[in-house]
């Protein structure tokens, strides 16, 4: 029981630290729509796509690796709660176009990055 807990804890810690670092480095550049949250979500989308495709080709790999990367790292890196708070803040300030644009970029961008991650592994496997 300790292996899964440690895998998730390690992944979450690393993902959370990266998200925090991205926020520190990027959010001052454009505070109305903090880019750190967007970059964190896009990176997490790409990594989860790579992980899904990679783990599909590695069925004998210990399940703790999936927990570390997908549940832990990507879960700690991506941030729906911060995204939600930022969107609500934009709406409260009457910046409706910014809010709708941010929603579209976060959701579409994350989906595109997940597909790109899957495509990356598929491309490497076929090369």
Curated annotation (Swiss-Prot):
Tell me which UniProt keywords the record has, alphabetically.
Answer: Cell inner membrane, Cell membrane, Ion channel, Ion transport, Membrane, Metal-binding, Sodium, Transmembrane, Transmembrane helix, Transport
Q: Which domain of life is it from?
A: Bacteria
Which terms does the UniProt entry file under GO BP? cellular detoxification of fluoride
Report any Pfam family annotated for this entry.
CRCB
Which GO MF terms are attached to this record?
fluoride channel activity; metal ion binding
The compartments listed are:
Cell inner membrane
Give the residue range of the signal peptide. none
User: Which reactions appear under catalytic activity for this entry?
Assistant: fluoride(in) = fluoride(out)
Give the residues the record marks as binding Na(+). 75, 78
Give me the Gene Ontology terms describing cellular component.
plasma membrane
Instruction: Work out whether the entry's keyword set contains Protein biosynthesis.
Output: no
Which chain regions cross the lipid bilayer?
4-24, 36-56, 68-88, 98-118
Notes on how activity is controlled = Na(+) is not transported, but it plays an essential structural role and its presence is essential for fluoride channel function.
Q: How does it sit in the membrane?
A: Multi-pass membrane protein
Q: What does this protein do?
A: Fluoride-specific ion channel. Important for reducing fluoride concentration in the cell, thus reducing its toxicity.
The entry's family comment says:
Belongs to the fluoride channel Fluc/FEX (TC 1.A.43) family.
Name-wise, this protein is: Fluoride-specific ion channel FluC
This protein's species is Nitrosomonas europaea (strain ATCC 19718 / CIP 103999 / KCTC 2705 / NBRC 14298)
């Amino acid at each position: 029981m300790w292996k899964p807990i440690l895998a998730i804890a390690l992944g979450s810690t690393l993902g959370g630290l990266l998200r925090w670092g991205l926020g520190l480095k990027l959010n001052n550049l454009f505070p109305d729509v903090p880019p750190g949250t967007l970059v964190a979500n896009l990176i997490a989308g790409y990594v989860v796509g790579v992980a899904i495709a990679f783990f599909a080709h590695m069925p004998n790999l210990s399940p703790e690796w999936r927990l570390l990367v997908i549940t832990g790292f990507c879960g700690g890196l991506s941030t729906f709660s911060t995204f939600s708070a930022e969107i609500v803040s934009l709406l409260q300030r009457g910046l409706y176009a910014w809010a709708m644009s941010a929603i579209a970029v976060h959701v579409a961008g994350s989906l595109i990055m997940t597909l790109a991650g899957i495509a990356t592994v598929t491309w490497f496997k076929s090369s």
